[in-house]
């Protein structure tokens, strides 16, 4: 809104005056009546009109000034230089600022702690009406801006050190660096001390370093004796820089006076662990180097929150495990240092509260840490995610095991308290069957044209991770195949779980293998079992066969114990294209060790199959592995679960069969379909440990 126009104000005043003159019944007019004809003397009425109009003019002027100032503030917030996304949607930190301006002035509401036994019901109530109660609770939080001053953060020398102009540390909780001689305000960094559940200053919440502040960031890590950095953003999201890369990819680099050397880097599906050795490079420094672990959570999507809290809970446990008890505050940062950072800190604190008091008080804790750093937990979606993570933790607990305790755990799972109780294994599997099948996310598979492509209509892919084929020109629905991307232990979308091809979907199957550059096919069914078709034979016994634009030629077929290994030369050529034919070798591992009924008698065959597939992947590159049985869920899920579980056993000496299977069921319905298959997962792991424990460092 532009400044209130004086001409407009004058025009409005004149209208008021004319309205007053035109009213014949007013006392003012009657005072001017006279026995003499003619108009009244205008000079005589001026003092009275002036007294009437002055208050109106003053009121209008004050209103104009107020609206101009309000509009200016809103413009400053919304424009915020280049902090808009290309489509005009405001970034999270800007959404929060605008939202705070429109907050209801009514008094604060009170939200009480929730006993954990009531947590599921409370979340159900709050989630009704599109999470209306969650939004109400979130909008009742204090912003944190009122409780502190921001003088240091707003100093001219420090403004360029702030990534976002409206995300600043309070003066009373900011991290203070040692002053560098001759450099004013060199004690400033955009970072705040944040309490844990009961531990004061357990965390430092910081913005993602800018190029100009990397030296300060490492100075803070050294001076605060921090041993753990938690990173919750990617370097770029939506093509916008969220954090400057403040570490070397390899070797050493010096940031200011701190030398940082890479010691190790382990990439997992949800996060990456980097280990650095840091050491000050001052002439008179004789301090010993320190080891700093950076845990970088890479599964936070560009929009919203993670689809499931499982990955975050695993990540948080790893942070707790790696952080030494004697170390300084854990440094936590995202981009602004409030949204994802606050979410992580609140989940950690509330998990501790569950252990201590068997209840959670999310509202009170978020209110408290917003006094230390404004806007912690930035959106209602993040606020809701906290509750979802806490419910996941309460319902399923910590099911992770060290390999040395597996045998004892299996004994517990096979025991019962009374004859009427289910054994622990059945109860564990029952919890898995409670994982909700999200039918609302199966719209594509449920289209009539695509339902004809399903072997089992209950087992179709979710829309969010279905394998998408290129659309054939002029042919609708040809981008669909009943197949789902499934995460591996170290890599997202490492597997393509699919059904055994039908006669009319063989071409789609080979198109998928070709387009997604899959060099490995794992087949876990026979073509026929119990006189029923389970899978169309999609390869030639000899010579070659063509499906659409793809020709498959068999080059070799060898049987080793229970596994047939077939090598195919796959050729792709579009009939009307002038380009040369493209060829690729694809290897199929056909496992014959699965009986028609039940599960394999021992686990060695499955262990050998997984090892052979991994060796093939190392030679051909880590493109997706195509895995199928008949419906693409039971045996397929068991193979993928065991691949991920055994990979973790080898890498960490840890396993979590329950969460491994639960994660698969969130990606494709009915994965690991029966109690027998679930128990088989435990059996194979035990066999693996027994076979390799003599020369592997498991125990």
UniProtKB/Swiss-Prot annotation:
Q: Which SUPFAM superfamilies match?
A: (Phosphotyrosine protein) phosphatases II
Q: Which SMART domains match?
A: PTPc, PTPc_motif
The PTM Phosphotyrosine maps to 695
Any one biological process term the GO annotation gives? negative regulation of insulin receptor signaling pathway
Q: Name one GO cellular component term.
A: nucleus
Active site, renumbered: 334 (phosphocysteine intermediate), 629 (phosphocysteine intermediate)
Per the UniProt entry, the Enzyme Commission number(s) are 3.1.3.48
Q: What class of enzyme is it?
A: hydrolase
The Tyrosine-protein phosphatase domain, residue ranges: 134-393, 425-688
Q: Which PROSITE patterns match?
A: TYR_PHOSPHATASE_1 (PS00383), TYR_PHOSPHATASE_2 (PS50056), TYR_PHOSPHATASE_PTP (PS50055)
Entries under InterPro entries matching the protein:
Prot-tyrosine_phosphatase-like (IPR029021), Protein-Tyr_Phosphatase (IPR050348), PTP_cat (IPR000242), Tyr_Pase_AS (IPR016130), Tyr_Pase_cat (IPR003595), Tyr_Pase_dom (IPR000387), Tyr_Pase_rcpt_a/e-type (IPR016336)
Q: Which reaction does it catalyse?
A: O-phospho-L-tyrosyl-[protein] + H2O = L-tyrosyl-[protein] + phosphate
Q: Which UniProt keywords apply?
A: Cell membrane, Cytoplasm, Glycoprotein, Hydrolase, Membrane, Phosphoprotein, Protein phosphatase, Repeat, Signal, Transmembrane, Transmembrane helix
Q: Which GO terms describe its molecular function?
A: identical protein binding; protein tyrosine phosphatase activity
User: Residue span of the signal peptide, if any?
Assistant: 1-19
How is it modified post-translationally? A catalytically active cytoplasmic form (p65) is produced by proteolytic cleavage of either isoform 1, isoform 2 or isoform 3.
Question: Tissue specificity, please?
Answer: Isoform 2 is expressed in the spleen and thymus (at protein level). Detected in fibroblasts, myeloid cells, macrophages, and T-cells but not in B-cell lines. Isoform 1 and isoform 2 are expressed predominantly in the brain, testes, and lungs, with lower levels present in lymph nodes, thymus, spleen, heart and mammary glands. Isoform 1 is expressed in osteoclasts and not in osteoblasts and its expression is related to osteoclast differentiation. It is also expressed in the erythrocytes. Isoform 2 is strongly expressed in skeletal muscle and L6 skeletal muscle cell line.
Q: What the record says about its domains?
A: The tyrosine-protein phosphatase 2 domain (D2) mediates dimerization. The extreme N- and C- termini of the D2 domain act to inhibit dimerization and removal of these sequences increases dimerization and inhibits enzyme activity.
Q: Which family does it belong to?
A: Belongs to the protein-tyrosine phosphatase family. Receptor class 4 subfamily.
Function, as annotated, reads:
Isoform 1 and isoform 2 act as a negative regulator of FceRI-mediated signal transduction leading to cytokine production and degranulation, most likely by acting at the level of SYK to affect downstream events such as phosphorylation of SLP76 and LAT and mobilization of Ca(2+).
Q: How does it assemble?
A: Monomer. Isoform 2: Homodimer. Can form oligomers. Dimerization is increased by oxidative stress and decreased by EGFR. Isoform 2 interacts with GRB2.
**What is this protein called in UniProt?**
Receptor-type tyrosine-protein phosphatase epsilon
């Amino acid at each position: 809104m532009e400044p209130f126009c004086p001409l407009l104000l004058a025009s409005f005043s004149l209208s008021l005056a004319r309205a007053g003159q035109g009213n014949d019944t007013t006392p003012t007019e009657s005072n001017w009546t006279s026995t003499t004809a003619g108009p009244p003397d205008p000079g005589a009425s001026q003092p009275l009109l002036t007294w009437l109009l002055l208050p109106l003019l003053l009121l209008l002027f004050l209103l104009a000034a107020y609206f101009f100032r309000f509009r200016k503030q809103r413009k400053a917030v919304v424009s915020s230089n280049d902090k808009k996304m290309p489509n005009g949607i405001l970034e999270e930190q800007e959404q929060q600022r605008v939202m705070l301006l429109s907050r209801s002035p009514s008094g604060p509401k009170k939200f009480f702690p929730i006993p954990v036994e009531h947590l599921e019901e409370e979340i159900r109530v709050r989630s009704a009406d599109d999470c209306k109660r969650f939004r109400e609770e979130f909008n009742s939080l204090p912003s944190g801006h009122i409780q502190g001053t921001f003088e240091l953060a707003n100093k001219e020398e420090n403004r360029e050190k702030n990534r976002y102009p409206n995300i600043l540390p309070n003066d009373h909780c900011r991290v203070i660096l040692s002053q560098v001689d001759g450099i004013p305000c060199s004690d400033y960094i955009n970072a705040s001390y944040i309490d844990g559940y009961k531990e004061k200053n357990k965390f430092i919440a910081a913005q993602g370093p800018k190029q100009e502040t990397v030296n300060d960031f490492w100075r803070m890590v050294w001076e605060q004796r921090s041993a753990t950095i938690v990173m919750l953003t990617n370097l770029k999201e939506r093509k916008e820089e969220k954090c400057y890369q403040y570490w070397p990819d390899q070797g050493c680099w010096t940031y200011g006076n701190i030398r940082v050397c890479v010691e190790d880097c382990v990439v997992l599906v949800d996060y990456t662990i980097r280990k650095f050795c840091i050491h000050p490079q001052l002439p008179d420094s004789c301090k010993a180097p320190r080891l700093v672990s950076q845990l970088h959570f890479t599964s936070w999507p560009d929009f919203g929150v993670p689809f499931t809290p499982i990955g975050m809970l695993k990540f948080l446990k790893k942070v707790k495990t790696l952080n030494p008890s004697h170390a300084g505050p854990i440094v936590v940062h995202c981009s602004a240092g409030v949204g994802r950072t606050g979410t992580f800190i609140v989940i950690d604190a509330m998990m501790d509260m569950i252990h201590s008091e068997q209840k959670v008080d999310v509202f009170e804790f978020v209110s408290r840490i917003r006094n230390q750093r404004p806007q912690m937990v930035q959106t209602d979606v993040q606020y809701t995610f906290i509750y979802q993570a806490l419910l996941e933790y309460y319902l399923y607990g910590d099911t992770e095991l060290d390999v040395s305790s597996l045998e004892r755990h299996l004994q517990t799972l096979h025991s019962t308290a009374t004859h009427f109780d289910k054994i622990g294994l059945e109860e564990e599997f029952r919890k898995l069957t409670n994982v909700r099948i999200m039918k609302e996310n199966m719209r594509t598979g449920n289209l009539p044209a695509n339902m004809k492509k399903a072997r089992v209509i209950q087992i179709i892919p979710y829309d969010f991770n279905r394998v998408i084929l290129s659309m054939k020109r002029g042919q609708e629905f040809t981008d669909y195949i009943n197949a789902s991307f499934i995460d591996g232990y170290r890599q997202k979308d490492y597997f393509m779980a699919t059904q055994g091809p039908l006669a009319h979907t063989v071409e789609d199957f080979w198109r998928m293998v070709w387009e997604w550059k899959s060099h490995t096919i794992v087949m876990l069914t026979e073509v026929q079992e119990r006189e029923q078709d389970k899978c169309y034979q999609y390869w030639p016994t000899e010579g070659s066969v063509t499906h659409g634009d793809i020709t498959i030629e068999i080059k070799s077929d060898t049987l080793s114990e229970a596994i047939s290994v077939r090598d195919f030369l796959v050729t792709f050529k579009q009939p009307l294209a002038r380009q040369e034919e493209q060829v690729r070798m694809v290897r199929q591992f056909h496992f014959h060790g699965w009986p028609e009924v039940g599960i394999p008698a021992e686990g060695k065959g499955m262990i050998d199959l997984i090892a052979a597939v991994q060796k093939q992947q190392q030679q051909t590159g880590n493109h997706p592995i195509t895995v199928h049985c008949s419906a693409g869920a039971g045996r397929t899920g068991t193979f993928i679960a065991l691949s991920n579980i055994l990979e973790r056993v080898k890498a960490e000496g840890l396993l979590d069969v329950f969460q491994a299977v639960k994660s698969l069921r969130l990606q494709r319905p009915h994965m690991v379909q029966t109690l027998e298959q679930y128990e088989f997962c435990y059996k194979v792991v035990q066999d693996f440990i027994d076979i390799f424990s003599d020369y592997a460092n498991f125990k």
